[in-house]
Design a protein with these regions (language model features):
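Phosphate-handling DNA/RNA-contact segment within nucleic-acid enzymes
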Residues: 1-128
């Protein structure tokens, strides 16, 4: 398996006060976060109501790291980039499931931000 330090550093797990390792995304659907080039740099997780009754936090994201800064990433950009270039426009939606729903409906030039408000660097990223 992987070393404890690696699992904590990557954000897949966290350490409790009593030094136990816990899965950050337990009971959640996991969404990989890709860079523009397709590299997976983080994960997001949405709670499954049936698996985690009483959980108050609907979404959990990987913590920022050496390779992941949420203000620099757009969810779905890797899969949307060709459609954005082809159609010369991009829809910015709220979250992971919105991007997936639109892709399933045939609208591929769509991304979601990780920050509110939307940062200026997103505008630059969408103009590449």
């Amino acid at each position: 398996g992987y070393k404890k330090e690696y699992l904590v550093k990557t954000g897949l797990c966290y350490e409790t006060d009593d030094h136990r390792l816990r899965d950050r995304f337990w009971g959640r659907v996991i969404f990989p976060v890709h860079t523009l080039s397709g590299k997976v740099v983080a994960f997001g997780g949405r709670v499954l109501a049936s698996a985690t009754k009483g959980v108050k936090v609907k979404y959990v994201n990987s913590p920022e790291s050496e390779i992941y800064h949420k203000s620099n990433e757009l969810y779905g950009i890797y899969f949307a980039k060709q459609a954005i270039v082809k159609q010369d426009r991009c829809f910015l939606v709220e979250g992971y499931t919105d991007v997936i729903s639109m892709h399933q409906s045939g609208i591929e030039n769509v991304v979601a931000s990780y920050d509110s408000p939307v940062h200026q660097q997103y505008d630059c990223a969408l103009r590449w």
